[in-house]
């Protein structure tokens, strides 16, 4: 059996560590040695901040890979938005996790690895988005000449928004709606894209009016400061906007991808305000000038028409001048007509005399003899033709009579007789009904006449007064003293003489 001294290192003086001890010692060594380092590398595996606000990714080069983390506090202080593939310089400290034997860098500050790296990334993104057609000039929209509402996407504080509002107020005051965003840092791009999309989703008749034009503005700065406006999400939002967008990011020499996607690029925020609205005073002056030109043109037009009318009136002949030639032609035609009628009458008389001389009693006698002979011949032919016609009609009648059968005639006769009997009965019934109706109507009229007759009034004790001519007396003013009157009662007439001043007592007062 071998002794313990046969195992290598069994009696060595090397210190013995547990796993925890060696891991802790390694952690202290790494953190003490690399407590503050600057690491240059390419961002890999970046997916944006976690829900906690921290960001996890890796820095790599062509031979190694280093895990990295940025805590939420440091993330909010970054002046640019990290992106996949961006080459950066990270400042922080290395640390290890004993539980997994891994190490990483905790980044406190990070910046792009020089303008060259950002420009290379910017050029690659520009080419890719241009290939998708996001910068196509055919997609550009025209700015409205007279907007009602302007939407501004910028920081609510600072000189930019003040310059825009002041410039709009000077040129043509109208409503301005500001959508506040951060114009620098990691959240700049998403906030600007959200603002552009938000303005586009506003309804036309909502409580917040939908702008007619948008201004995305920011002051000047470095490439890193303006990097949020190169964000792909911003470019896509501006390119898809249904509202025309004016880009006013940085100074005139600063170019970002939003400038290529916007419908119009302004060199400064103040220039964007000037593009968005016209100058009210210029519009008023132009309107006044156009109105004056229109009035002058109308005056010249009417003056020219008036002068042309006067010239035409002067050149036009008078009515006597116009009618002189037709009147002379009419007189000449009338004189020619008289002569022509006389000549024509003479010609007709000569022609008639010529025909009259050609006529003679012997010629007339011969013509009469010819006519008598023709009439005699027609008279001789007429009996024979009439006899032939009658024989032909008789033959046709006999032929048709032989074809006729007495049965249809008898049937139709019986049917006609039955119909006549029915008509007779209906006629007698109608006559009786008519006689009864007339008799009832006559009786009703007789009763009505007796009711309306004055004789029925006499039956009730009244009397009718007639004058000497037998006409009824309708009023006392028609009777004079001494007039002979006749009073008719129910049972006869009584003669009376009218007297003056006689008052007849009212029979109703004695009752």
UniProtKB/Swiss-Prot annotation:
Its EC number is 3.1.11.6. The keyword Hydrolase applies. GO terms for cellular component: cytoplasm; exodeoxyribonuclease VII complex. It catalyses: Exonucleolytic cleavage in either 5'- to 3'- or 3'- to 5'-direction to yield nucleoside 5'-phosphates. Keywords: Cytoplasm, Exonuclease, Hydrolase, Nuclease. It is found in: Cytoplasm. HAMAP family: Exonuc_7_L. Bidirectionally degrades single-stranded DNA into large acid-insoluble oligonucleotides, which are then degraded further into small acid-soluble oligonucleotides. This is Exodeoxyribonuclease 7 large subunit. The gene is xseA.
